[in-house]
Amino acid sequence: MKHLFKIFVLGLMVLVSGCGDWLDIKPQTESKEDDLFAKEQGFKDALIGAYIQMKQNSLYGQNLTYTTLEYLAQHWNYSLVTYEENLSTYVYSDAIVEATFSSVYEQWYKVILSCNNILNNIDGRKDVFTKKYYELVKGEALAIRAFMHFDV
């Protein structure tokens, strides 16, 4: 009986003390800022991420190229009473119109935040860059951020 009790206590101690590492799992698609900006490739990945955010449907993938803006400018005709008519007649209180503009502004500021993260880290880590990539990455991040602010 004592032997069984010792095994039980030992097993309980292993389970209680050993679970912390198993529960601390980092998702493969996320990375910590320090890890991301430790190498030149991390800065490039962050910049590519900003471009990918820009091509979302809520920004230049749809709303700010050929749908929402066209209805606001009244370039397109619509056949039914829909949110497109509300866009064309500037009824901004419509729930779908509000959601559309909310997603546009939210995505704009996500892109600005991504560029700000790059710019906050790039000057302190010039040593990780080769050739002229420092100027290239910093210039593109500044340009994207300026473009987003201009469009807002």
Language model features with spans:
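Membrane-proximal, proline-rich intrinsically disordered regions
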Residues: 19-67
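Acidic helix-start/capping segments at beta-turn-to-alpha-helix junctions
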Residues: 67-74, 137
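Secretory-pathway/luminal and periplasmic proteins that interact with or process carbohydrate-rich
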Residues: 55-61, 75-78, 148-152
